[in-house]
């Protein structure tokens, strides 16, 4: 596939073609995802759980993120690389700039920040300095201790109204993409229609502009044995990891994944 840029993703949204994203942490899987046609590789702080064995993403450092971004870059030829700013890496505007620079210099094309309206100043600062930003809303794993666990967000009308307003405000602040996690399908559809930038979902129904899953989850690999409702094991019925990756891309593009059973109601 040709090199994927923000312009590519914006064009896919306008054409109504679904965007495919998977987490990726190393060169070998970056190459495999390229071969399968995955358009965005998310170097996520989820590596703290699936690679390092922690029970949350909080222990992950910016240095560790930069290491994995560089690894993915070496195996990547076509996909856009999106990198998480880990826990407290954007606690101040100065830290936001410094840590974003480390990830971009390691090979990221875009950084992702978790939160809500309070992110506006950070997003504006980065966008003005040439750093594209994806705003991660809904269930934000870095805030798991405040949220009281990994729970669906936006189910009551006040939360839903605030999330819609925040999404529009973050777009106006300069966010180039949104990621909605564990949000009622109807609310995710409304937000996707309300903003001009691409919206990627995970546990957010089928009406977002694209989908993302944790690589290990969609390959049926789990330390805990707990499988989130929004996950499908794409290794089932396949004879290789490469076939599973291609099946994921095919099903997202065809809008057969996610199904109703993978989403949440209000």
Curated annotation (Swiss-Prot):
Q: Which GO terms describe its biological process?
A: pantothenate biosynthetic process
Cofactor(s) needed, names only, are: Mg(2+)
Subcellular location as annotated: Cytoplasm
> Which InterPro entries has this protein been placed in?
Pantoate_hydroxy_MeTrfase, Pyrv/PenolPyrv_kinase-like_dom, Pyrv_kinase-like_dom_sf
What is stated as this protein's family in its record?
Answer: Belongs to the PanB family.
Described purpose of this protein according to its UniProt entry? Catalyzes the reversible reaction in which hydroxymethyl group from 5,10-methylenetetrahydrofolate is transferred onto alpha-ketoisovalerate to form ketopantoate.
PANTHER family, alphabetized: 3-METHYL-2-OXOBUTANOATE HYDROXYMETHYLTRANSFERASE
The protein here is known as 3-methyl-2-oxobutanoate hydroxymethyltransferase
